[in-house]
Swiss-Prot record:
InterPro entries: RlmM_FDX, RlmM_THUMP-like, RNA_MeTrfase_FtsJ_dom, rRNA_MeTrfase_M, SAM-dependent_MTases_sf. PANTHER family: RIBOSOMAL RNA LARGE SUBUNIT METHYLTRANSFERASE M, RIBOSOMAL RNA METHYLTRANSFERASE FTSJ DOMAIN-CONTAINING PROTEIN. Belongs to the class I-like SAM-binding methyltransferase superfamily. RNA methyltransferase RlmE family. RlmM subfamily. Monomer. Catalyzes the 2'-O-methylation at nucleotide C2498 in 23S rRNA. Keywords: Cytoplasm, Methyltransferase, rRNA processing, S-adenosyl-L-methionine, Transferase. The lineage of its organism: Bacteria, Pseudomonadati, Pseudomonadota, Gammaproteobacteria, Pseudomonadales. This is Ribosomal RNA large subunit methyltransferase M. One of its GO terms (molecular function) is S-adenosylmethionine-dependent methyltransferase activity. GO terms for biological process: methylation; rRNA processing. It holds the Pfam family RLMM_N. It catalyses: cytidine(2498) in 23S rRNA + S-adenosyl-L-methionine = 2'-O-methylcytidine(2498) in 23S rRNA + S-adenosyl-L-homocysteine + H(+). It is an enzyme of class 2 (transferase).
Length: 358
């Protein structure tokens, strides 16, 4: 079980390889990363039998940027018939698992396996339960089967509290019919990823205020309004009338990079298409100057050296706050709804503590 298998957005396999190789080196896990461009997956093959397990135990999945999902395990070939017997035979070396997910990679070929996986899961789950290899226990590892085809599957394990919260790392979010653009799902997914669900009522509630920089037509503003917040939308373009009719939105025709709120707000969100260094500087300024407590900002990626650029910007942000003497939580992820970009979340810790006395 010396291979770490990872899902990702097609075209970002190289970034996954660079990122996981760096963490493996930090944890003294020897091996090599490999991937095929456009395959929507990557592997890190460890030279030691326990390498993949040590790598997963030493690294929090939520802190990885480009991998959508991961599991440690092995590839096995399957026959056309009686696949279950072959899987059960290989599972003799596996521990009893607490849950089962069948996955496929995010490519056209992978999507064609969706119906097969749905039907096959019913029979496989029954067989695993009867064999005593599957129980309902989240404290036990999750069994992840990623089908590359009907004849090849990666059998892997991952801890449910240190892996993706959705199969393949793809959220099942419904587009709100009254939202003005599909970009609204990007911010909703960011909240799921960066904020524990049991903290939403505390950190995303109707007594809060927010600013949306580059807001038009209002996809991200809609999410803030949907939580009951009073929102200042900054954009020279028009906002959706449905949002303005809520009475919760003030639209200011202004430049998102020069606007400063008269009073500090709880949230700043920004999805402006601009050079990533400029958006990163905006993020540092708003949190550092105390204009907001939490922020979600998208960083558009260059064509080359994308992981290196993201890492450089995150290090610059972190060093900037250290120089200011400000403690912050910094998160960064290429979300499913992101394209050539990553989403950053920052939370100023001192400010968050002070607000509890309100």
């Amino acid at each position: 079980m010396n291979t770490l298998f990872m899902h990702c957005r097609p075209g970002f396999e190289g970034e996954v390889c660079s990122e996981i190789a760096e963490h493996a080196a930090r944890l003294n896990v020897s091996g090599y990363a490999k991937a095929k461009t456009g395959s929507a997956c990557a592997e890190f093959v460890c030279t030691e039998e326990d390498g993949a397990q040590r790598l997963m135990h030493g690294q929090r999945f939520a802190e990885l940027i480009f991998p959508r999902q991961w599991a440690r395990g092995v590839f096995i070939d399957l026959p056309e018939t009686d696949r279950i017997s072959v899987i059960l035979a290989h599972l003799r070396e596996f521990p009893v698992c607490g849950s089962l997910w069948l996955e496929m990679v995010d490519t056209n070929d992978g999507k064609e396996l969706s119906n097969f996986c749905k039907k096959f899961e019913v029979h496989l789950r029954k067989a695993l339960l009867n064999a005593g290899k599957l129980v309902d226990d989240p404290s036990k590892p999750r069994l992840l089967l990623t089908f590359k085809s009907g004849r090849e599957v990666f059998m892997g394990l991952a801890e449910s509290n240190n892996s993706a919260m959705w199969p393949m790392g793809i959220p099942r979010l419904k587009f709100p019919r009254d939202a003005p653009s599909r970009s609204t799902l990007k911010l909703e997914e960011a909240w799921h990823h960066f904020i524990p669900r049991d903290q939403w009522d505390e950190r995303l509630h109707g007594d809060m205020t927010g600013v949306d920089l580059g807001a038009a037509p209002g996809g991200w503003t809609w999410q803030l309004v949907n939580r009951g917040m009073l929102v200042t939308a900054i954009d020279n373009g028009p906002m959706a009338e449905s949002l303005m009719d809520t009475g919760l939105v003030q639209h200011l025709m202004a430049d998102g990079f020069t606007f400063v709120p008269k009073q500090p707000v709880d949230w700043m969100v920004c999805d402006i298409v601009e050079k990533p260094a400029r958006n990163a500087a905006l993020l540092e300024t708003w949190i550092g100057e105390g204009h907001c407590r939490e922020a979600v900002v998208n960083l558009k990626l260059p064509m080359k050296q994308r992981y290196a650029e993201v890492k450089r910007l995150l290090e610059r942000i972190e060093e900037g706050f250290k120089a200011r003497g400000i403690r912050v939580e910094i998160g960064c992820k290429q979300l499913y709804h992101d394209r050539e970009e990553v989403t950053c979340h920052l939370r100023r810790l001192e400010t968050a503590k002070k607000t509890k006395a309100r």
